Amino acid sequence: MAMRHLSRSRDVTKRSTKKYIEEPLYNRLFKDGGTEVKVRQQLNQFLKGTKHVFKWEVGDTIKKLRNRGLYYPALKLSEVMEERGMNKTVSDQAIHLDLVAKAREITAGENYFVDLPETSKTELTYGSLLNCYCKELLTEKAEGLLNKMKELNITPSSMSYNSLMTLYTKTGETEKVPAMIQELKAENVMPDSYTYNVWMRALAATNDISGVERVIEEMNRDGRVAPDWTTYSNMASIYVDAGLSQKAEKALQELEMKNTQRDFTAYQFLITLYGRLGKLTEVYRIWRSLRLAIPKTSNVAYLNMIQVLVKLNDLPGAETLFKEWQANCSTYDIRIVNVLIGAYAQEGLIQKANELKEKAPRRGGKLNAKTWEIFMDYYVKSGDMARALECMSKAVSIGKGDGGKWLPSPETVRALMSYFEQKKDVNGAENLLEILKNGTDNIGAEIFEPLIRTYAAAGKSHPAMRRRLKMENVEVNEATKKLLDEVSQDV
C-alpha cells in the first residue's frame, strides 16, 4: 500500500476513489461499533485491501484509537503501515513505543527503545519510555531514566516531569513533588497547566491549602500559563475535599467564567462538584446550560447527571431524566440503568428494580456483573442468601467488561460465610465456595476456616477435608485445626 504526504488540502472527499479509500479511515474502522473486536475486524479488512491512505490520516487514526484505549489495533496499524513504506518520524516512534508497551507490556517497550537508532533516542522517545514507567508505577526505573537523560544532556520536557510527579502522587510520595518543581524551574523548563494542577494536588494531599493558593498566585504573577477551567476545577475539588464550601463555590464560579469554549468535560465537573456541595439548584442550572451548549446530549452526560441526582436523594428527578434519556437514546447504556436500579434497591423498591432489569434486554441493554452485584447486595442485606448466591453466580459467570474475572468483595463473602455458620448451613457455605471457584483458583483460609466451623456447628463431617486443604494449599489456624479432628477423618 503506497503512502503519501498530504501536500495541500486534507479534504478526503476530493480523493480519487480508484486509488484511495472512499471514507475517512477512522470512520471505516468504527463502522460496526466501537468494541475492540469490531474495530479489529474492520482493520483486518482494510489491511487486506489495496486502497491507498494518506500518512496524516494514519497518524490521526492511531491518535484516536489510543485515546479510546484501543492499543492493539493502533499498534497493528502502525506496524503494517511501516512495513508498507510509511516513514516514521521520531515523534511517530515515541507514539509507537507507547503502543508497544501498552499492548505487549513494558518489557517489549524497553526492547523497542533499545533497538532504535541513536539518532532517534531524543527527549521524545526517552520521555515516552519514562511515561510508560510512570504509568506502571515503576518508580526506580523512572527516576533512573530521568537521571540518564540528564547525564546525556537531554533536557526533560514538562510532560516528563508531569509524569514523574503524577507517579509520586499515586504512590503516596507527594513530598517529592516540590523538589521536582524546583528542578523543573532550575532547568528552565516551561510548566503547563497540568504541572500546576499536579503540584496543587500534591500540596492538598498534605492539607497545605495555603500552599495550594500560593500556586494560583504564582500562576497569576508568572503570566506565562494563565489559570484555565481545569485549574479552577482542581481548586474547587480540593476545597470540597477540605470542607471549605464557600471557597469551593467561588472556584466553581471562576470555572464557569473560564469555560468560554463550552467544554463538555468542564460541564461534567461543574455538575459533579456542585453535587458534592449539595447544591441541587446549581446542578440543574448547569445541566440546562449543558443542554443549550451541546444539544445532542451523550450517554455519559446522562450517566453523570443521574448519578449526582441519586446521591442528592432526588429520585423523582433521576427518574424524569432516565425517561428522557430512554426516549431518545440510540444506545441503551446499561450503566445508566444500573444507577437507577441501585437507587431503587437502596430505597427498598425491589419491584421497580426488577422491572428495569427485565426491560433492559428488550431495549438492547446487556445486563452486566454490576447489575447482578446490586441485586446480590440487596438480598444479602435482606437476609435472602439463596437469591444472593444466584445473583453472585450470574455476576461471576459474566465477568468484567474488559474480560477480567469478577469477584464479590471480601466483606460480602465474610457476611455470607458468617450467616451460613450461624445457620449451620453446610450446603449454603459449599455453594458459595463453588461459585467463588468459578472466578478464582485462590480459595484461602478466609473461606475454609468458616467452612470448617460450619461443618462443626452443624455436627456434620467431611471425610476428605484435610485432603481438600492440602490440594488447595491452604494453611488454617490452630483453632480450626482442632475442629478438623471432629470434621475430617482423613490423615
From Swiss-Prot:
It comes from the Eukaryota. Component of the mitochondrial ribosome large subunit. GO terms for molecular function: mRNA binding. NCBIfam families: PPR. This is Large ribosomal subunit protein mL101 (rPPR4). Keywords: Mitochondrion, Repeat, Ribonucleoprotein, Ribosomal protein. PPR repeats lie at residues 122-156, 157-191, 192-226, 228-262, 263-293, 298-328, 333-367, 368-402. GO terms for cellular component: mitochondrion; ribonucleoprotein complex; ribosome. InterPro entries: Pentatricopeptide_rpt (IPR002885), TPR-like_helical_dom_sf (IPR011990). It comes from Arabidopsis thaliana (Mouse-ear cress). Pfam families: PPR, PPR_2. It is found in: Mitochondrion. Belongs to the PPR family. P subfamily.
